[in-house]
Design a protein with these regions (language model features):
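Catalytic Walker B motif of ABC-type/P-loop ATPase nucleotide-binding domains
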Residues: 153-156
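A short, surface-exposed alpha-helical micro-motif characterized by mixed small hydrophobic
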Residues: 195-197
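A short, proline-enriched helix->beta-strand linker immediately N-terminal to the Walker B motif
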Residues: 147-151
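C-terminal boundary and immediately downstream tail of ABC-type ATPase nucleotide-binding domains
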Residues: 205-206, 213-233
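The feature captures the beta-strand-to-loop junction immediately N-terminal to the Walker
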Residues: 35-37
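Conserved ABC ATPase "signature" region
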Residues: 104-123
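Conserved ABC ATPase signature
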Residues: 128-132, 136
C-alpha cells in the first residue's frame, strides 16, 4: 500500500521555479530519507504535502495521493511550542483538537511519554518549554505528532542544532516508534550521516529536483559521507 505518491510535480512562487518534475513514493512502513542543502526545496516540498503552501505558490501535478492521517514535526522545537503555556495544557489542546473531548487523554499522554522515553515521575507535563532540554522538547513534539495516531509521519530537520549524542537518541526513538506503530516516516535533513542505518531509501533534492544515482552531486555527497563515517570508526 502506498502512503504517498506524487507524479510530475512542478511548483513556482512569484514566477520562480522551486520544484521541478518531482515524482516521489513512500510505501507502508517505510522510512524514507530526503536530503538536500539549504534552499534545495525540502521545506516547500513538506508544505506542499501538508497543504500549507503560501498564497503566492502555484503548482501543477499529474497525480497526488496521500493518506488522510499525517503527523508532522518541524525543525525548531522551541518556536513550535508556546513558551508561555505549560506542556500539559499544550498536549491537552492537541488531544481535544483530534478527539473533541478530554476523555482518556491522561492515559494516552502517559503512554506516549513512556514511548518516547520521558519519565512521568519527572513531571515534564508541568514544565514550560524553556525548562526542557533540546532533546526533551523534540520528544514532546513527537508526542504531539503521535496523538492523532497517524500512519504517516513527517520529521523536518528535527535533529538540527542537537548534539551528536542527542541526535542518536532521537533517531533511535524514531526507529522504535516505527516498529511499534508501523507508521511510514519521511525524514528530511541536510545531514546524510543522520540517515546511515536508518532510512530504507534516500532521495536527494538538488535545486528543486530529485536527482538520480548517477548525478555528480549525489555521487560527491555520498562519497564525502562515506569518508566521514570511516574517520569516525
Amino acid at each position: 500500500m502506498k502512503i504517498l505518491k506524487i507524479k510530475n510535480l512542478n511548483l513556482r512562487i512569484h514566477e520562480k521555479e522551486i520544484l521541478k518534475n518531482i515524482s516521489f513514493e513512500i510505501e507502508e512502513g517505510e522510512i524514507i530519507g530526503l536530503i538536500g542543502e539549504s534552499g534545495s526545496g525540502k521545506t516547500i516540498f513538506t508544505k506542499y504535502i501538508l497543504g500549507i503552501l503560501p498564497i503566492a505558490a502555484h503548482f501543477t501535478q499529474e497525480s497526488f495521493e496521500v493518506v488522510p492521517k499525517i503527523g508532522a514535526i518541524f525543525q525548531n522545537a522551541f518556536t513550535s511550542l508556546n513558551p508561555t503555556v505549560k506542556i500539559r495544557k499544550q498536549l491537552q489542546h492537541l488531544y481535544i483538537s483530534h478527539y473533541g473531548n478530554k476523555k482518556n487523554w491522561k492515559e494516552k499522554i502517559e503512554s506516549l511519554l513512556e514511548d518516547v522515553g520521558l519519565d512521568k515521575k519527572k513531571n515534564f507535563l508541568d514544565k514550560y518549554p524553556h525548562e526542557l532540554s533540546g532533546g526533551e522538547q523534540q520528544r514532546i513534539l513527537i508526542i504531539g505528532a503521535l496523538i492523532g495516531e497517524p500512519n504517516f509521519l513527517i520529521a523536518d530537520e528535527v535533529t538540527t542544532a542537537l548534539d551528536v549524542e542527542t541526535k542518536i537518541e532521537i533517531i533511535n526513538f524514531f526507529k522504535k516508534l516505527q516498529k511499534k506503530f508501523k507508521i511510514s516516516i519521511l525524514f528530511i535533513t541536510h545531514d546524510l550521516s543522520t540517515l546511515k542505518d536508518f532510512a530504507d531509501k534516500i532521495y536527494v533534492m538538488y535545486h528543486g529536483e530529485i536527482i538520480d544515482e548517477n548525478h555528480p552531486y549525489r555521487k560527491q555527497l555520498f562519497q564525502l559521507s562515506q569518508n566521514i563515517w570511516r574517520r569516525k570508526q
